[in-house]
Amino acid sequence: MLTFIIGLVILIGGAALYGRFCEKVFGPDDRKTPAYTKEDGVDFVPMKGWKNSLINLLNIAGTGPILGPIQGILFGPIAFLTIPIGNVIGGAMHDYFSGMICLRDGGTQMPEMIRRYSTKGIYKFYNVFVCVLLLLVGAVFIYTPGDIAATQLFGFDGKATSVSTWVIYGVIFLYYLIATVFPIDAIIGKIYPIFGGILLFSAIGIFIGIFVTGMPLMNIWDSWAAPVLSLTGADGTVGTFTYADYFSTKHFLPIFFVTVACGILSGFHSTQTAIISRTMKSERQGRNTFYNMMVLEGFIAMVWAAGAMGVYNLALQEPNAGLATGTVGVVCKYLLGHVGGIIALLGVIVLPITSGDTALRALRLSLSETLHIDQSTNGKRIKLAVPIFALVIAILVFAKTNADGFNILWRYFAWANQTLSLFAFLCITAWMFENGKGKWAWIPMIPGCFYTFICVTYIANAHIGFNIPWTPAYIIGVACAVAYVVACCMYGKKRAAKLLAK
């Protein structure tokens, strides 16, 4: 339990110190924001600070900070330290600078930010990559809340052959269409406070439940070799699960960081902070809206990691049995009882839905900005949304009807999500050099270098990637990480030199 508490102190204390430091480096001021200078009643709409913060939290927090930590905690209590450290210096910093640069540049979406602060080749590649990721996000965030609702809320079997499964998908899909097309304040701004209440109840309820029930949480200095429980394999053999075995055999680097994903860092978040940059009344709201909301997502990840470890150690749920979604229900009902568990499950369902809707909205905005498509009327917005939703349906059908479809979808989603952050780190570095802040370029380059290693090593070894053995995969990862830092420095200094020449 003490390691968990230390992790929370690192998260909260680190955020207070490093968040203020990042704010000082950026230098927010009192200039008029795009919400006023470009107000259109649809996407550029001034909204209150608390509402922007809540909407951003719900936008960025999907199933990642729940399902990721539930699987990531299998590596042991080291997760209680790596999640907060990575969140503070990586994820929250990424969200803050991405959102603030978009805000400072007139409420631009991420493709435009990439165009301004990188090369034409990177810009073109990013446009394709981000569109694919947002489609994957839309599909994943229909699939996961739909299945949790079907199996754990309504008691259906959740199979592809069941009409109930597709009816639930259809309801979520219809909401996504409405939220993608209509004015942000009319739909998202009105319903999100309700969703936020459910989310906060579930997260805080589980957090309190961990202490009230005295869940057995392992410390980093405890013996990781103690058997947690007996497992019966598919072949009938009986074995034991230990955190030590999992840590030593499952390649903590890079698997842990790709698995936990959103609780530490998510490239997807930059597409969401760009949306909120259009509704903020003041630049000075940025730290709370962007940085602190990512820290709050880190708190959610910590809570679910602890809840999962508790039920594993109590042998209430087998770590390797079934989907991580099964552990969600066990944690909720054990800690909060039947009624509280249902409300907590609603919170788990709300999280991905409130990310999926704005993911598809971000895709529409990005396409319209990149291709210069007029979005002034509902009809024109629907016209662009139709092909987007057709592709999401196709991905969803594949994931649901193929035996290994969702596993393939989730792996590509998780890897692409982390990889997308590398584009933002590059542009943040370039922005710093261009704005006379080159001495602070290490802020984005450290996590950028680390995640280049993580993402390249993972895809080099993965069966869904190049299927290269681990040793050469690690070598390739290190080489690419070094090359990333060199490229960032050279490109940043080149931009700074051009600026001085002018």
Predicted regions and their residues:
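Helix-loop-helix module between adjacent transmembrane segments
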Residues: I10-L11, A15, G90-G106, M110-T180, ...
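Membrane-interface "cap" regions at the ends of multi-pass membrane proteins
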Residues: I10-I66, S282-Q285
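Loop-to-transmembrane helix boundary motifs in multi-pass membrane proteins
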Residues: Y123-N127, S162-G170, N292-M302, A308-P319, ...
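Selective recognition of specific alpha-helical transmembrane segments in multi-pass small-molecule
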Residues: G7-L17, V130, L134-G138, G196-G214, ...
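Extracellular loop-to-transmembrane helix junctions
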Residues: M1-G19, G72-C102, P111, G341, ...
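Membrane-interface loop-to-helix entry segments
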Residues: I5, V9-G27, F129, P145-A149, ...
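Extracellular/periplasmic helix-exit of transmembrane alpha-helices
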Residues: G99, I210-T240, R284, N292-V330, ...
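Hydrophobic alpha-helical segments and their helix-loop junctions in multi-pass secondary transporters
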Residues: G138-F156, S164-V167, A179-T180, L199-F241, ...
